[in-house]
Every structure is written in C-alpha cells, then in structure tokens.
Amino acid sequence: MSNVIFFNSYKLKKGVSVPDFLLAVEKLSNEYISQQKGYISFNLLVDGETWADFTTFKTMDDAKRFAESSEPNKLAEKFYSFINLNSCKTHYFSVERSY
C-alpha cells in the first residue's frame, strides 16, 4: 500500500502577518498534526500569494481520518484565522513512486 499526500492550497487573508502565520503553522504541525495516526511528514509551500501544505500519511484511511476530524482544536482555529477559506482547495494523492 502506498503512502498518501493530503494536499491543500489557499491564500492568506489580506493584511495578516506572515511571521505570525508561520508561527501558527509551526505550532499546529509540531503539537497536533505530527501526533496523528500514520503521520510521516508535513511541508509548507508558497508561490507568490498562493500557499500550500502537504502532509504525508501511511494510508488513505489515516489521511481521511485526519482531514475529517471534528474535535475542537485551538491550534487549527488559530491557523484557519489567517486563511481566506473561500480560496481553499484540497486533494488526496497516492504516492506512485519515490526516487
């Protein structure tokens, strides 16, 4: 079974502090995402005004369980406070090959 990438792209709200956003991402990654079942890695990307992140999980079930989690989470709430939610796009990818 191949690993799965949970990929998200989005834009930040106008006027937010990028350093504050980066701190929120770091805390979310270190204190919550990395603790999830099947977690392998987390990456944050940027191209101009478009940001993206991808989290690698061991299985599709692990990725979907994480994505569909509805437990209250102050770290996620802080992260989403920086995001223009109308710009969000999400996709799951199965890793076909790694070189």
Predicted features along the sequence, with ranges:
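Short beta-strand
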Residues: 42-46
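Short, surface-exposed ligand-recognition loops at beta-strand->loop->(often short) alpha-helix junctions
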Residues: 11-23
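An amphipathic, aromatic/His-enriched active-site/gating alpha helix that lines ligand/cofactor pockets
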Residues: 27-28, 34-40, 56-91
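Short, low-order "capping/linker" segments at domain edges
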Residues: 92-99
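Active-site-flanking beta-strand signature of metal-NTP-handling nucleotidyl enzymes
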Residues: 3-11, 52
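Short, surface-exposed loop and linker segments with low hydrophobicity and enrichment for Pro/Ser/Thr
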Residues: 1-2, 37
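Residue-level signal for secondary-structure boundary sites
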Residues: 16, 61-63, 98
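Short acidic/glycine-enriched loop/turn segments that link adjacent beta-strands
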Residues: 47-51
